[in-house]
Amino acid sequence: MKALIFAAGLGTRLKPLTNTMPKALVKVGGKPMLEHVILHLKAQGFCDIIINIHYLGEQIIDFLRANHNFGINICISDERSEVLETGGGILKVADFLEDGEPFLVHNSDILTNIDLRGLYQQHIENEADATLLVGQRDTSRYLIFNHEDTLCGWINKNTGEQKPEGFCYDPAQHEAWAFGGIHVISPTLLHYMRSDGWSGKFSIIPFYLSVCQKARIMGSPIDPDRYWFDIGKIETLEEADHFLKNYEL
């Protein structure tokens, strides 16, 4: 199984830690974020991985080389000249990912022990075009799903803005979830990107919202028996670090 790890972020919310290193190499529980993600993917059967790099990307290349790619096939998608954001980053590596099978996308600043293989199998069984890991957490922006767990919109609860055009959030008919930074994508989504004219630098969430009325984009809630942390900011990094020091494997 194939996976893409997003490691091109600037890590502005982790300064001063990221003044001299890329976000993906900031340590949590004594190991770089990226190492946690790679080892989790490897343990779950994802042994063909591509990692995008941008800010201080040469440090990530050196880190992987020093660890012999952790014994699996790891390639680099070099975005050092221009970061392409999440959607553009996926499209850039389409040739690597597009072999007729779904692939998993994992943000490097998500620390979790969820069942990635199970998420992948659920995606296949549901015949989805994309399956997004989602959870309940405080944020202003939510993805909106119907009671069949199919994406149908987005809302900013602070401003009331809703997407796509014509969508109207109804709490009785919809559930609001926050995106969990991990998703499984089928090659059909890449076809939608190309046919709808998406190219260059773009975020994946606006793309999902643009195709949610014709593509099958599903949500999969985080298992409450598993841990999940967004460690992209200082306070949550410290929380995750404390958790790992006390976590019994």
Write out the residue ranges for each language-model feature.
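Conserved N-terminal catalytic core of the sugar/cofactor nucleotidyltransferase
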Residues: 2-5, 31-107, 118, 192, ...
